[in-house]
């Protein structure tokens, strides 16, 4: 009865020793593997070898590849990634020593150790979100410095000085200073009747009087020339009749034809 059991145990021990390269010397050097004459000693030696095995070399024939990584290996792997570290990139020289810290350091605080596992995960997620928002704000402020509305560079905007005229000085007591700018923008446009009576040559060649208001003859909205009025098709060679008179005559002719 004992020979099959001993053969199975020795076979398992041989499999462990064969698949474990570096751990084999550690198993034989331990005190638990010195006594292999009894079944209990062999089982203790197997347990010692199993404890020394890492997750990178799973236990055979078990399901060691399904087991999670150990804490030391997880720290080693996560330390290579950028998101494992916190801290602003544009930190000052005073914060160089305390600028970056790892995720595992947060979980080692004594206050956080009192909380449960779910609360600890929630706090870590909240800290990660806050740090991500701060990092985005710092990057946004850095990029916005290049634009005018982020950080104005150069001369500041100077206030516009308004000097009142002689006519505005008389009404300075009535209108406040803020309304004087609006008064300066009000132009007195010439009447159409006076322009029709005068020729273009007289308006341009005539001297400008001081008591007379300035007329903007060089602008388009001052008044169209005579050859451009009524759309340009009413030239003096054709007819001097206004456009409304032509429409009235056409309407009367159509009504007269319908009456016949």
UniProtKB/Swiss-Prot annotation:
Q: Would you tell me the Gene Ontology cellular component terms?
A: extracellular space; secretory granule
Localisation: Secreted
Which Pfam families does the protein's record reference?
ACTH_domain, NPP, Op_neuropeptide
Q: What is its main location?
A: secreted
Name the keywords, alphabetized: Amidation, Cleavage on pair of basic residues, Endorphin, Glycoprotein, Hormone, Pyrrolidone carboxylic acid, Secreted, Signal
Name the residues of the propeptide.
Answer: 104-138
List, in alphabetical order, the GO biological process terms annotated in this UniProt record: neuropeptide signaling pathway; regulation of corticosterone secretion
The chain residues annotated with the modification Phenylalanine amide are: 86
Valine amide PTM sites in chain numbering:
153
Post-translational modification as stated in the protein's UniProt record: Specific enzymatic cleavages at paired basic residues yield the different active peptides.
Q: Which residues form a coiled coil?
A: none
Family the entry assigns: Belongs to the POMC family.
Q: Under which name does UniProt file this protein?
A: Pro-opiomelanocortin
